[in-house]
Swiss-Prot record:
Protein name: NADPH-dependent 7-cyano-7-deazaguanine reductase
Pathway assigned in UniProt: tRNA modification; tRNA-queuosine biosynthesis
Organism: Xylella fastidiosa (strain M12)
Annotated keywords: Cytoplasm, NADP, Oxidoreductase, Queuosine biosynthesis
Domain of life where this protein originates: Bacteria
Family annotation (HAMAP family): QueF_type2 (MF_00817)
Annotated function: Catalyzes the NADPH-dependent reduction of 7-cyano-7-deazaguanine (preQ0) to 7-aminomethyl-7-deazaguanine (preQ1).
Catalytic activity reported: 7-aminomethyl-7-carbaguanine + 2 NADP(+) = 7-cyano-7-deazaguanine + 2 NADPH + 3 H(+)
Residues that, per the record, bind substrate: 81-83, 220-221
Keyword Zinc-finger: no
GO biological-process terms attached to the record: queuosine biosynthetic process; tRNA modification
Amino acid sequence: MNTSHYSVLGHTVPYPKVYDPSLLFPISRAVGRTQIGIGVVLPFVGEDRWHAYELSWLDARGKPCVATATFHVPCDSPYLIESKSLKLYLNSFSAEVFNRAEALRLRIAADLSACAGAAVAVEFGLPPVGGGDKEISLDRLNVDIEDYGPPNPDYLSNVAQNFVEEMVEETLTSTLFKSNCPVTGQPDWASVTVRYFGVPIDHEGLLRYFISFRHHAEFHEQCVERIFQDVLQRCAPQCLAVEARYTRRGGLDINPLRTTSEMAWPLSVFRDPRQ
């Protein structure tokens, strides 16, 4: 079983001088999911969307080319891709010759698919920087905070209502989210968005819950799945989508999305201003 302890993460390694797909390191999703009660049947659909800012290769005449790219790793793949290994892998193209950029795209797609154990879509370019027009920022709340971990789902609740329960659709966001790499301890900063339809969720409790990740060590993808599970179990929305847009490290940022229904709950694809 592949775990992060056997990866290059947290180790000093030389940058590759030649193309090497064996640098890619898969980590089983099952390990983290077992810890939060997720079995073989997933309660969500979604993807891990990677933005790559440092991609370079040589054309047929030896002239360097540069590009940005977006990778879409399906959340039902058996493996997630460890970030430092992906950085090193992409850097291994710096002296590789391609007659066409399309040949490079196909090569990357094939290698990432082999690592993840499922089809990974690759495209050149990045989504625009933006934000949702109807988002409600939780950062505006005037609250006292004393709990920074471990993640505490007891903060999550619905707003108390009298008589008939009113159903609402809301998109709640916070830029205050922080978790930590489970191997190196480095901070991982993100903007987190929760979109739902159901009985109103208590905003202050959700913000406190987000901040309770501040000392928590877990991979990006696992944090989002933990949030999804906790909100679904504690607040019981009819529809739910959770997305985190993590800030860039090593020329990459990752944006895990988990949603109850891909058709009914597509979130706008954009980059956070901090990315």
